Amino acid sequence: MSAAAAALAVPAAASAQGATYNWKMATGWSGGPLMEIGSKAFAERMDQLSGGRFKIQVFPGGALGNALKVPETVKNGIAELGHTWMGYDWGKDPTTVLFGGYAGSFDTERMLHWMYEAGGVEMQRKFREETEGIISFPLGARTAEAFLHSRKPVKTLADLKGLKLRTAGAWLEMAKDLGAAPVTTAGGDVYPMLERGAIDATEWGTLYENIPMGFHKIAKYIIYPGVHQPTAPFELVINKEAWGKLSDADKKLVETVARLVTIDFWLKVGHEDAKALEFFKKAGNTI
């Protein structure tokens, strides 16, 4: 139903005759929900709602460039599109947390209200164009993340002392202040690092998103929900030159599909998180 509703919002000219495009999308994901109901969902719906005029090939993290620097890959023209999380640019510009979520922020529902009804999308677009020279829209928004999947119990702030933790964004700096030893790495590297003991614990996504990551096999202690990330909107980045070649109708199509996927992503993840809680319990994890 949601796809049909979105189709009604797309100008008729966008899905009728017009230019054709064969674009590449760089991502920060090795797989899982971020890839399937985020990146690939966007590509599939662009194809459907354009009448087949937009063909977007989606690449896993690292295939076209550094998985943590997707905006750079897109800006340099290696890919026309990218799907990333703006918080990865925290070290470059702390302003990014306003659009990627941060510790103690409001929840996803209120973040969506701000983005789509109170000017957040327009502010994000202006910020990224002025600072990075790229076009930016929200693409996907998750519910509260799991705070930790840990190889050892973490029950008090004292237990964070010296904890080798994989994280990113503003929480990395906060975790340092709490005595942890945080590092940032792409999602595809997290499980191997946990397995060989290079890190003690990780945060990544919501409970549902973390199932395919396999953390439950080796990190048996979970803290949920994560106050470090009550919401996490993701980002569609577009090469400015490629964007400039689109008609106004096709630009509207891109915006509409990005909004559709964002809402659908939030609904899907929120629904699946409840079932995921039971999955981790049955897997012998302590929550």
Mark where each language-model region is.
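N-terminal secretory/targeting leader peptides
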Residues: S2-A6, S15-H113, E122-I287
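Polar helix-capping/helix-linker motif
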Residues: E117-A118
